[in-house]
Amino acid sequence: MSEKYVVTWDMFHMHARKLAERLLPASQWKGIIAVSRGGLFPAAVLARELGLRHVETVCIASYDHDQQGDLKVIHKAETDGEGFIVVDDLVDTGNTAREIRNMYPKAKFVTVFAKPAGAPLVDDYVIDIPQNTWIEQPWDLGIGFVPPLARK
């Protein structure tokens, strides 16, 4: 990936709330299926904003920090997805999204961020990201000392 897009907690929360607005009225939903791990964060925001208490997970391993590998389903919610929102932080190449679509064909699949290759596979998202851009999510970052410019 040649570019990086750094997301702060404030930005993420704002975008996740915007996604929640698009999912109203809340009465149409039975619950949320969060794609672990990136989808756990927007799932918490959606659950709060939509007043939903039923939150399931689907655990699919595909990344090792910035390298995408083979998909491995570790755990899946036992439903066809009817009445459920499936949420992930990002749709990138679409590999994970295709697997999720097969598992939950009746769910509404949403993400906060979408890259061009994966965007057609989700029902809704908030922010377009160029395909060659790596997203640094706030849960992957820490706060550290930065030396003054004069010391570099």
UniProtKB/Swiss-Prot annotation:
Residues engaged in binding guanine: D92, I135
PROSITE patterns: PUR_PYR_PR_TRANSFER
Binding site for xanthine: D92, I135
Binding site residues for 5-phospho-alpha-D-ribose 1-diphosphate: R37, G38, D88, D89, L90, V91, D92, T93, G94, N95, T96
CC per GO annotation: cytosol; plasma membrane
Binding of Mg(2+), residues: D89
Catalytic activity: GMP + diphosphate = guanine + 5-phospho-alpha-D-ribose 1-diphosphate; XMP + diphosphate = xanthine + 5-phospho-alpha-D-ribose 1-diphosphate; IMP + diphosphate = hypoxanthine + 5-phospho-alpha-D-ribose 1-diphosphate
Cited Pfam families: Pribosyltran
Entry membrane topology: Peripheral membrane protein
GO biological process: GMP salvage; IMP salvage; purine ribonucleoside salvage; XMP salvage
Keywords annotated in UniProt: Cell inner membrane, Cell membrane, Glycosyltransferase, Magnesium, Membrane, Metal-binding, Purine salvage, Transferase
Domain of life: Bacteria
Stated role: Purine salvage pathway enzyme that catalyzes the transfer of the ribosyl-5-phosphate group from 5-phospho-alpha-D-ribose 1-diphosphate (PRPP) to the N9 position of the 6-oxopurines guanine and xanthine to form the corresponding ribonucleotides GMP (guanosine 5'-monophosphate) and XMP (xanthosine 5'-monophosphate), with the release of PPi. To a lesser extent, also acts on hypoxanthine.
Protein name per Swiss-Prot or TrEMBL: Xanthine-guanine phosphoribosyltransferase
Gene for this chain: gpt
